[in-house]
């Protein structure tokens, strides 16, 4: 339950508490701090999807592979990974979307030298009206729509 806390706790609470903690250990205004907080916010999504995929995983496949002479590394790459890949990919996509959406945490943790695309868009919307922001937003919508259509197409091919 501790691992899914970032999903449940309001983002402002996470941002302020992370800011206070990182200020004490010197990670504010650093790329390392920014990466750590975004990893912590994305980890619950990866964990829940991968664990859900692993619950339906049949351990007999690994035993059969090992009994037929495959080494553990080959078993992982040829048996386990292809089966859990959809869970890993969906978790990674959720983590990316969450990280991309977290402007609040970035505003608290990042210094003036750490500029992310969401932060730049937020600043652009607030401070100056610029058609670049509309163009980037349009590209993001096209990217998301294309990604969703590709996933649906791949799902249809598996059936």
Language-model features: locations:
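Transmembrane alpha-helices
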Residues: 15, 39, 46-59, 72-101
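C-terminal transmembrane helix and the adjacent membrane-cytosol boundary/short C-terminal tail
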Residues: 51-66, 70-81, 134-159
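Residue-level signature of the transmembrane alpha-helical core
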Residues: 1, 5-8, 35-39, 80, ...
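Cytoplasmic-entry segments and transmembrane alpha-helices of multi-pass inner-membrane transporters
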Residues: 1-20, 62-63
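A structural signal for multi-pass alpha-helical bundles of membrane permease subunits
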Residues: 15-25, 93-98, 126, 151-152
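Interhelical loop and adjacent transmembrane-helix boundary motif
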Residues: 100-150
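Hydrophobic/aromatic residues in alpha-helical transmembrane segments
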Residues: 1, 14-18, 32, 46, ...
